[in-house]
A protein has these predicted regions:
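Walker A (P-loop) phosphate-binding motif
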Residues: 1-27
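Conserved active-site and cofactor/substrate-binding residues in soluble primary-metabolism enzymes
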Residues: 16-17, 38, 71, 75, ...
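Short beta-strand-centered segment that lines the nucleotide-binding/catalytic pocket of NTP-utilizing
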Residues: 29-44, 117-123
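Switch II (G3) loop of P-loop NTPases
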Residues: 36-38, 110, 136-145, 152-162
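P-loop NTPase switch/communication element
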Residues: 39-60, 126-128
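Cysteine-centered iron-sulfur cluster-binding motifs in ferredoxin-type domains/subunits
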Residues: 64-83, 93-113
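Short beta-strand "wing" residues that participate in macromolecule-binding interfaces
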Residues: 87-88, 116-117
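Conserved Radical SAM active-site core
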Residues: 95, 122-134
């Protein structure tokens, strides 16, 4: 079973409700709480006896342009749905905060001048408190892309739990 506490004004008690439900179901031993507020997670603070089990970086794919191979044809910028690339006469500009890591630019490049690298956008944490598994993510300072980190938190929390 999944119970979601979502979409409310800040300070209304979403975290309090979620952690209270988790704590009340803890005796079943099959409770996981996924704090998807990756900009300011705090559900783990309600479980002071937690033990940190895992801390893992979350990465997204980003293009790397090999300038010496690039002919500045502009196909990469044309195919980019998020306008993360701008082709100028002498260079290609990448706006990493706009890039969604789809890889279309590297596929379309006729010169094979675009490869992919990865960039850390934050961390995922896994902890355990008696009867409760806690999963949360912390977005790196200055990072704008919350969606991939939220997705990683949700994937990590999947299982036979409430």
């Amino acid at each position: 079973m999944k119970i979601s506490i979502a979409s409310g004004k800040g300070g209304t008690g979403k975290t309090l409700v979620a952690t209270s439900i988790a704590a009340s179901l803890a005796p079943t031993g099959r409770v996981a709480i996924a704090d998807c507020d990756v900009e300011e997670p705090n559900s783990y603070l309600f479980f002071p006896d937690r033990v940190l089990l895992e801390r893992k970086e979350c990465h997204v794919a980003v293009p790397v342009i090999e300038e010496e191979k690039c002919t500045h044809c502009g196909r990469c910028a044309e195919v980019c749905a998020y306008h993360a690339l701008a082709v100028l006469p002498q260079t290609v500009l990448l706006f990493p905060e706009l890039c969604h890591g789809c890889g279309a630019c590297s596929i379309i490049c006729p010169e094979k001048a675009i490869s992919e690298s990865s960039r850390s956008i934050g961390e995922i944490f896994l902890a355990r408190s008696p009867g409760v598994e806690l999963v949360w993510g912390e977005l790196a300072l200055g990072e704008a892309r919350t969606t991939p980190l939220i997705k990683a938190v949700k994937e990590r929390a999947e299982g036979d739990t409430v």
